[in-house]
Amino acid sequence: MDNIREGVRQKYAFAIANRGQGCCGSPGCCSDGLSDAADPITGNLYDESDLQGLDPELIANSFGCGNPTALMNLNLGEVVLDLGSGSGLDVLLSAKRVGPTGKAYGLDMTDEMLAVAKENQRKSGIENAEFLKGHIEEIPLAAKSIDVIISNCVINLSGDKDKVLKEAYRVLKPQGRFAVSDIVIKRPLPEKIRDNILAWAGCIAGAMTEEEYRGKLSRAGFENISLQVTREYNLEDPSLRGMLEDLTDGEIKEFQGAMVSCFIRAAKPA
């Protein structure tokens, strides 16, 4: 797991330090959340109305695969935690929705991301947000302290997803909600992709099947589990082919249509 974690950390540190060049060293791996012209995973995720008052640079540095703040009706006064908060977009959107009596935490392991997130918070003038350094497998918050957990294309990056989901369950209050966007695969990936760190950092190699996701959430204690497909990816896209270079053309065609983004919802029992 340490090798995966360090590989992911390096890729996203590079992405935020070289904004506009892509997290994998080429254009298209990580682009803004408004236009889908450049990137098959991160493009066209947010409505412009949601982003009013936020710095355009913040929007351009969102590296997710969905809009988890659209998943859940956040209530005034609630406490939200974003696992793998990156440059802070979903944290700041959540903070606006829960109002001054609520709070939004962002957790990230990458110093470069945290620095940018804190600067974005300063520019936005939002006071009810806090960014924490740490790992999503070891959440530095008390048990039963969070109303809603969100995450945006991050859980697939972990080498120990069981631990992530158990930690999420631990920090949620009874009846707390789990609402994330993540990459899901319809069929298992070939082992040669699973061993490719570039494909891990690109949100491909660590993706779970729907059955795996449901099983791990259930074993962690969650109930009312649902997965909703929101986007299907074209593996012929040049941005994805660079991470799938170990596959033959025949294998690409065989796996076509098997990689999707999903909204994943679950709840902690009362």
UniProtKB/Swiss-Prot annotation:
GO molecular function: arsenite methyltransferase activity
InterPro entries: Arsenite_MeTrfase-like (IPR026669), Methyltranfer_dom (IPR025714), SAM-dependent_MTases_sf (IPR029063)
Gene Ontology terms describing biological process: methylation; response to arsenic-containing substance
GTP-binding among keywords: no
Domain of life: Bacteria
Keywords: Arsenical resistance, Methyltransferase, S-adenosyl-L-methionine, Transferase
EC number: 2.1.1.137
Catalytic activity reported: arsenic triglutathione + [thioredoxin]-dithiol + S-adenosyl-L-methionine + 2 H2O = methylarsonous acid + [thioredoxin]-disulfide + 3 glutathione + S-adenosyl-L-homocysteine + H(+); arsenic triglutathione + 2 [thioredoxin]-dithiol + 2 S-adenosyl-L-methionine + H2O = dimethylarsinous acid + 2 [thioredoxin]-disulfide + 3 glutathione + 2 S-adenosyl-L-homocysteine + 2 H(+); arsenic triglutathione + 3 [thioredoxin]-dithiol + 3 S-adenosyl-L-methionine = trimethylarsine + 3 [thioredoxin]-disulfide + 3 glutathione + 3 S-adenosyl-L-homocysteine + 3 H(+)
Name of one Pfam family that matches: Methyltransf_31
Listed PANTHER family: ARSENITE METHYLTRANSFERASE (PTHR43675:SF8)
Family, as annotated: Belongs to the methyltransferase superfamily. Arsenite methyltransferase family.
Name this protein carries in UniProt: Arsenite methyltransferase
Protein's organism: Clostridium sp
Taxonomic classification: Bacteria, Bacillati, Bacillota, Clostridia, Eubacteriales
